[in-house]
Amino acid sequence: MLVIGNGRMITQDASNPFLENGAVAMDGNTIVMVGVTEEVKKAYPDAEFIDAKGEVIMPAFINAHEHIYSSFARGLSINGYNPQGFLDILDGLWWTVDRHLTLEQTKLSAYATYIDSIKNGVTTVFDHHASFGHITGSLNAIEEAAKDLGVRTCLCFEISDRDGMEKSRESVMENVNFIKHALADDSDMIAGMMGMHASFTISDETMALCNELKPEGVGYHIHVAEGIYDLHQCLKEHGKRIVDRLHDWNILGPKTLLGHCIYVNEHEMDLIKDTDTMVVHNPESNMGNACGCPPTMRMVQKGILTGLGTDGYTHDMMESWKVANVLHKHSLCDPNAAWGEVPQMLFEGNAEIANRYFKKQLGVLKEGAAADVIVIDYDPLTPMNESNINGHLMFGVNGSMVQTTVCNGKVLMKDREVLVCDEAKVMADCRQAAKELADDING
């Protein structure tokens, strides 16, 4: 038994959203009680007690779109790389990195990403992986890191024809085999999806193969209209817009997650809504790649299940929230834009996305939900109550303020110390791997 208490508790449970002095009791991987600290301690007097000391207690974060393979690109300088557009960024940086990754480097990239996620209070990660130099076994390598560190993750490999049809088919089989493996795993900590890069790198032949081989019970995770070229190519080669093409290939549906969706129109948004397909917004990436601003506020208004991701730019979901907030205010010239929509995406949207792949309820502190809890070092200087929670979180909190992270009832980090690995040793291994990757890329 574990109790975390003596903190300002944000539950994300509409029936009991805020407790001035709250506590959460966990038995194994399940929350068994949420209430006033004194009452919870009285109910479970023998439980291990973590004193939040007035700090904020809340559900752990969920990242709905991550790229583990990008971990070692931080600070990477590639000879001759001078991108003039998004396609140059893809080919000159990201596809170059993924073609050179070894299985060991992929695994260490996963350790680096998951450790940083833990330190930012993220315990559930939807990753979209690519390592076309070493495809087979790459998802299992990532899974090993996730299980070792105790985080929950949903994995896929981005299917693409960009490196030829042999590797394309291998990437299809990597997804198929991992999905079957994940479906047989009863831990509720691992899930799989059919990953796809984007419409413009996937032929009809490969679409048909995916349709034929995809196991039942899962959907797709694909970048959609991230850059304008994706749309132009689809119109030219297929005579239709991207979402229409995906719909025609039975890609859309409640288990499918579409990344970005920058260049989609009203008709496409209606298709996404009508098929109950999920969308994930990645604001920093869209801005950093100069791709544009998606009509995310319109999607939320239409009732499309929309979540928030980082696309590998950061592992701090609070940072992604802050950027999304100012991006849409700026883009729409509306000071009210994104105020309610973005926290809805981060908390309600990401939780619903995760709950389509994991059995236990995530993203909320309530009886029966998953024991995924964080403590944040935030002692507000202004009044805090259920009516102004989001204002405090957005303007007062960042990921580095997370002190304690619990996932599935296991304490992964306490008082900023990662407990589930020798962080210094892992980071030393990662630094060496990053150097070897950079040397290999630059010849």
Model-derived segments and spans:
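Active-site microenvironment of metallo-dependent hydrolases
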Residues: 1-22, 26-32, 37, 42-43, ...
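Divalent metal-coordination and catalytic microenvironments
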Residues: 7, 24, 29, 54, ...
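Alpha-helical scaffold segments that flank or form the walls of functional sites
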Residues: 57, 76-128, 133-151, 173-185, ...
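Active-site gating loops and adjacent loop-to-helix segments of metal-dependent hydrolytic enzymes
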Residues: 72-106, 162-164, 228-255, 275-278, ...
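Metal-coordinating catalytic core of metallo-dependent amide/deamination hydrolases
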Residues: 129-262
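Glycine-enriched alpha-helix->loop->beta-strand junction motifs that scaffold or abut catalytic
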Residues: 150, 214-219, 251-254, 271-280, ...
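His/Asp/Glu-enriched, well-ordered alpha-helical/loop segment
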Residues: 248-251, 255, 297-380, 394-398
